Regions:
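Histidine-anchored nucleotide/phosphate-binding helix
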Residues: 28-38
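Extreme N-terminal starter segment of soluble prokaryotic enzymes
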Residues: 1-5
Length: 114
């Protein structure tokens, strides 16, 4: 049983900074929140991804309950692309593709509903 459930976006982020570029980095509000909160308590995540998603092991390896991640066959995972200058507090959005997140209807897994 999870002490905390994070519901939100699970995404792939493509980031460009003056220091380099990273393609398809695991991102999204539910991911970032889960990774941080998991340092203090048991966390479950609820979100939706396409069948192109391969980031679930990253969360599971850290003990995060991924049973609430819905995988939509034939769909694509939410993706965001942005650029940062030397002020890393300011992001410029270059592209946003909602993919399956556009139709997201959050559902707790049976285990998470306990």
């Amino acid at each position: 049983v999870n002490s905390l459930i994070a519901v939100g976006s699970i995404a792939y982020d493509t980031l460009e900074t003056p220091f380099g570029r990273r393609d398809r980095a695991l991102g999204g509000s539910a991911v970032h929140f889960s990774l941080a909160a998991n340092l203090f308590t048991d966390v479950g995540v609820v979100g939706v991804v396409g069948d192109d998603f391969d980031g679930e092991p990253v969360l599971a390896e850290r003990g995060i309950d991924t049973s609430g991640i819905q995988v939509v066959a034939g769909g694509t995972t939410f993706a965001w692309e942005g650029r940062y200058g030397f002020d890393l507090n300011v992001a410029e959005t270059l592209d946003t593709r909602l993919g399956v997140f556009e139709q997201f209807d959050p559902q707790l897994s049976e285990e998470q509903a306990k």
